[in-house]
Amino acid sequence: MAMASSAYAPAGGVGTHSAPGRIRPPRGLGFSTTTTKSRPLVLTRRGGGGGNISVARLRCAASSSSAAARPMSQPRFIQHKKEAFWFYRFLSIVYDHVINPGHWTEDMRDDALEPADLYSRKLRVVDVGGGTGFTTLGIVKRVDPENVTLLDQSPHQLEKAREKEALKGVTIMEGDAEDLPFPTDTFDRYVSAGSIEYWPDPQRGIKEAYRVLRLGGVACMIGPVHPTFWLSRFFADMWMLFPKEEEYIEWFKKAGFKDVKLKRIGPKWYRGVRRHGLIMGCSVTGVKREHGDSPLQLGPKVEDVSKPVNPITFLFRFLMGTICAAYYVLVPIYMWIKDQIVPKGMPI
């Protein structure tokens, strides 16, 4: 579920449209840093073998921000748009059958979408970074397909989505999660699953989520959780963005969202969401309480389009990112085996 490319122009802006059948990789690599302030957050958890837990009060320190703790400029081998584009060209072949069973099951998907409150089939919903349409399949169970838009950067992923019979009425398009090609106040629900980890500037993407929602609309962001175990943290930080729970909350609040809540998710046999992280480890929701654009002001989007990519550097980054990804394919297998051995109720 890769991040969307800039194949479409934002509302009121100027952009280019790819010709049908033509595959054009995105050109940007830009990074920017964000900062957070100390604020309390509300956390609930479901899944991961633990069921519901009591609401906890956490306080995030300034040192937990992405800028202070894990600078956006540090190497992440698949977070860059170009690497992600080619990575998903090959991964799209096996994504639904190899990746999803360990990281994004149907039960997890339905559980994660519950806070989005898809109560009516008439709701207008956008699935940003929807990839092969696995999350969209969960959406169209509750919303009429003609009211749903699926947007992603990868034409290879989107081709897989177009093959799904249940998505025949869905509008499927290429686009950029940080520069959405929709007018302000368009959708009732914004959903994004497994995409934020590829965004060079997560705050900008969440600001866009706020902009395209109507008054009273709900954004539901489903993504990874930063691990606490040193080896998993090493691979996570090298691979792509695994935000801390506090960072999700802070990004939502800065964008203008109210009633921000976070829920941990995970396969029932995966008793280690916080220890090892998980590509789909939490579901964050926020409500838009005012008309119009986000109150947050950001500078121009930074894109490195002038410098050509060194093929050797690109290959190195791609291979290293693939190694990190392989680790996170093996972790669920390891956790499943441990779940069969370690008695239920005991930490693993």
UniProtKB/Swiss-Prot annotation:
One of its GO terms (cellular component) is chloroplast inner membrane. InterPro entries: Methyltransf_11, MPBQ/MSBQ_MT, SAM-dependent_MTases_sf, SAM_MPBQ_MSBQ_MT. GO terms for biological process: methylation; vitamin E biosynthetic process. Pathway: Cofactor biosynthesis; tocopherol biosynthesis. It comes from the Eukaryota. GO terms for molecular function: 2-methyl-6-geranylgeranyl-1,4-benzoquinol methyltransferase activity; 2-methyl-6-phytyl-1,4-benzoquinone methyltransferase activity; 2-methyl-6-solanyl-1,4-benzoquinone methyltransferase activity. Involved in a key methylation step in both tocopherols (vitamin E) and plastoquinone synthesis. Catalyzes the conversion of 2-methyl-6-phytyl-1,4-hydroquinone (MPBQ) to 2,3-dimethyl-6-phytyl-1,4-hydroquinone (DMPQ, a substrate for tocopherol cyclase), and 2-methyl-6-solanyl-1,4-benzoquinone (MSBQ) to plastoquinone. This is 2-methyl-6-phytyl-1,4-hydroquinone methyltransferase 2, chloroplastic. It comes from Oryza sativa subsp. japonica. The lineage of its organism: Eukaryota, Viridiplantae, Streptophyta, Embryophyta, Tracheophyta.
